[in-house]
Every structure is written in structure tokens, then in C-alpha cells.
């Protein structure tokens, strides 16, 4: 599908649930957020229907997210069914890793193509401070289990919420020790993310070069998104940056998002989109559903404008509710 600005949109991120087994400080309050009822979230049959229609329109890659997608029963089974849809080329998963080790075999059987693990620190006490839960040991069990399968693409996503440079050095060191790509993701001012000091790509890169030596740009692409990568001598994996704030990549954006309650939207910043759940439960045909999906794509905003004055169209929900 091509939007009105000429961008090819072939990537759909699907939030399976707004629930999570962690309470990361930049994502939700310690007490959590009011969870949607089972009746409010899309059924797997509804998700599959959307995926089939989206594939017919040109969507080729699906990312399963949350909340934490692995807390919803049957995640691997859904992934397997999505993989079987004609036109779908890749199905990937973003997880906090807590439940990964115990569900990895089912995910591999489903044919999952890649797994991204969200991890912001290697320090158990800092992990507990950021996530407000224990669990670092479980995350590493998941990482080690995934590393036992060399054909599985594994990446670490790290939000620089802890400003101490030793933390950046430690996280990046995973790419030195293992064949893992470590990506630092600039905090976007959405939900609780607005409350934290901003750490930009250049400051993190300077810390890493001081610790590990020169970083050289790598032209290869690893995955579906806008990450740009660097190599470091002696590293088994690459270091990447997703820098939506300082290196705006909206002109190359290739995605739309589906929230767990069935709202499809074109940009993280804005509430603008369409309630696909309401259409389906109202009895729409597949042709009508496809037209609704196409309109979201066609009307995808030209860019985010987080530096501009707030508007009534700005998203008011947090990342766990939108889908990370």
C-alpha cells in the first residue's frame, strides 16, 4: 500500500494485550492501568481477519507486541496462523523476556522469524527500580534459550532511562559477547515517557566510543524498521540506534499500528485512526474492512511533531495501551 505521501506501508504492529507482568517507570504507573476486559480486546479470530485483509492490501510483515504479548494465552498459536496467511513474509515478536524461555519452543514451532527483547539494564537492583518487579534472571534465561537457536534473529531494545554511562556500556557489551544486535531507542514524549530526562543518540555513541573504540556505520538492514547500525571491532553483534527525536525518520516510515482493542492508527503521536473492532462487530464485509484499513494508510500523517505545541489530536494513552 502507498500512502498519500508516497511511502510504502507494508508493516503492521499488533498489540495483543494491554496487560504486562512488569511496571516499567516510563510505560505505566506502579499500580498498573485499568485493564481492558476480555470483551473489549480483539479476539484471535478478529486479529486473523484483519491480518488476512491487510495482507491482501500489501502488508507483508507483522510484529506482535503488548503490553507483554506472552501473557496472553495462545500467542504462539496465533503467530503460526498469521505465518500461514498468503502474502505474510515475516512474523516477529517484541517481549520483555520474562516468559520467553518457557514459551520459546512453541514460538519456534510457530515459525517466528525474530524476537526483540526489551532490556534497560544488566544490574538486578536497577532492573527492579525501572521495572518495579524482579525478573532479570528470567530475562537472561530467555536470552540464553534464544541464543541456542542460531537461525533465530535476536535483538535487544534498550530505552536509555538510566543516565549513568556505565549502564550504556554494560548493555552494549552484550553485542560484544554474543551475536546479538543491541539497539538504543530514544525516549519519545508519550505517556509516562514525558517525565524523564532525554538521552540522545550522540551522547550515548560518545560514551560507547570512549569505552569500546570507534564505531563504523553499517549499511546493512536488520529487520523491519528505521534502525541504523554501527560495528565495533571485536563485537559479535551490531549497535543500533532508533532515534525518532534527533534523527527523524518519518519520511521512511513503513508502518501502521493496531491496538489491542482494535483501533488502527498511522502514527504514535496522534489519536487519529479507525475503530476496526466496531466495524467488524457491526457486521462489515471484508471489502468494507479493507477500505477502512486502506483509509488509515492513505491518511497516515506526514510526520510526528513532538517539538511543536500540543494539539487536541495528540495521543493521550501510554505505550502499554497503544502497543509498544
Task: List the predicted regions and their residue ranges.
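Canonical Radical SAM [4Fe-4S] cluster-binding loop centered on the CxxxCxxC motif
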Residues: 4-44
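Glycine-centered loop/turn positions within well-structured domains
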Residues: 22, 124-125, 248, 274
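Short, small-residue-rich loop/turn micro-motifs
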Residues: 18-20, 28-31, 119-121, 186, ...
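Conserved, mostly hydrophobic/aromatic
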Residues: 16, 20, 64, 93, ...
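Radical SAM/AdoMet-radical enzyme domain recognition
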Residues: 41-64, 71-185
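Residues that scaffold the ATP/ADP-binding catalytic core of kinase and kinase-like folds
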Residues: 23, 27, 72, 125, ...
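Auxiliary Fe-S-binding modules of radical SAM enzymes
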Residues: 1-11, 176-177, 187-324
